[in-house]
Amino acid sequence: MRSKKMINEKLKMWWETARPKTLPLALASIFTGSALGYWANPQGFNGLVMVLCLLTTILLQVLSNFANDYGDHQKGSDTEERIGPLRGIQKGAISAKELKWGLILMVMASFLSGSFLIGIAYENLSDLFAFAGLGILAIVAAITYTVGVKPYGYMGLGDISVLVFFGLLGVGGTYYLQTHSIDSHIILPAIGSGLLASAVLNINNLRDIEQDAKAGKNTLAVRLGAYKGRVYHCILLSVAALCYLAFAVATAISWTNYLFVLAMPLLAKHAIFVYCSQQPSELRPILAQMSMISLLINILFSLGLLIG
């Protein structure tokens, strides 16, 4: 019984380290990219490609979360003073060596899933080499956010990375794998999705702003300061909403293209709360909320395309 309880506790720690509340970010961009692909080419839509895109992106997200905890632990950034939840490695439930092996396992799983995806979806050698390169870049980016001599997350570049990988590549890459074409219109929802994902990261950074500043982790929130960081958050949300709206106006055939507007009151309420917050601790429950709002907007946007 004791052994079973220990195993369950260990699995629980690994589950917490995977940060399931961040996984909607992985789903959102793939749903949107897949819906755009179906909208543009319903006859050529490949369900297996969509499933593999989802799997690969989830694995990359978990890899990034493992790497984040490992890197912050190695640099002493995650202390008991942090407002966010304590991770398995902070509690001593997972050792640095175990987490490193977890990282290696996730690299292998991401690589295998991505390779299978490319093998199924590519049409020519250019596609093969381009997406192989992007896949390797995604793995490297997931690790070097906090791991390495000069992790870019410590230089305030995390927001740009999230915009690229959860927006331009997540949406645009999925769309291309479904249609094997490029449409300039998709840049709008791709940017919108990326900005919403960046808003999730910004909430995390605003919450941990004091501890990050002490540890020398110069996130964009640390560089801007608390007030400007909250203003920046509202700008992210406003521009994201405008991107989805601009796409709907430019391409709308049916009123259903505006379904995502149903989530705008939630987005506005969230923005007001963040802007009016005075203490980082107030933002602790808001990260999961922002993640779910992002997923909801992308689901409604995707649904509008599919039934329009």
Curated annotation (Swiss-Prot):
Pfam families with a match to the protein in the record? UbiA
Recorded catalytic activity of this chain's protein:
an all-trans-polyprenyl diphosphate + 1,4-dihydroxy-2-naphthoate + H(+) = a 2-demethylmenaquinol + CO2 + diphosphate
Question: Which Gene3D superfamilies does the annotation name?
Answer: UbiA prenyltransferase
Q: In which pathway does it act?
A: Quinol/quinone metabolism; menaquinone biosynthesis; menaquinol from 1,4-dihydroxy-2-naphthoate: step 1/2
Subcellular location per UniProt equals:
Cell inner membrane
Topology in membrane: Multi-pass membrane protein
Which terms does the record give in the GO molecular function aspect? 1,4-dihydroxy-2-naphthoate polyprenyltransferase activity; prenyltransferase activity
Keyword tags: Cell inner membrane, Cell membrane, Membrane, Menaquinone biosynthesis, Transferase, Transmembrane, Transmembrane helix
Matches recorded under CDD domains: PT_UbiA_UBIAD1
EC numbers: 2.5.1.74
Q: Does the keyword Transferase apply?
A: yes
One biological process term from GO is:
vitamin K biosynthetic process
Query: What GO cellular component entries does it have?
Result: plasma membrane
Principal EC category: transferase
User: Keyword Iron, does the record have it?
Assistant: no
Spans traversing the lipid bilayer: 22-42, 47-67, 101-121, 129-149, 153-173, 186-206, 235-255, 256-276, 286-306
Provide the function of this protein: Conversion of 1,4-dihydroxy-2-naphthoate (DHNA) to demethylmenaquinone (DMK).
The record's comment on protein family reads: Belongs to the MenA family. Type 1 subfamily.
Protein name (database record):
1,4-dihydroxy-2-naphthoate octaprenyltransferase
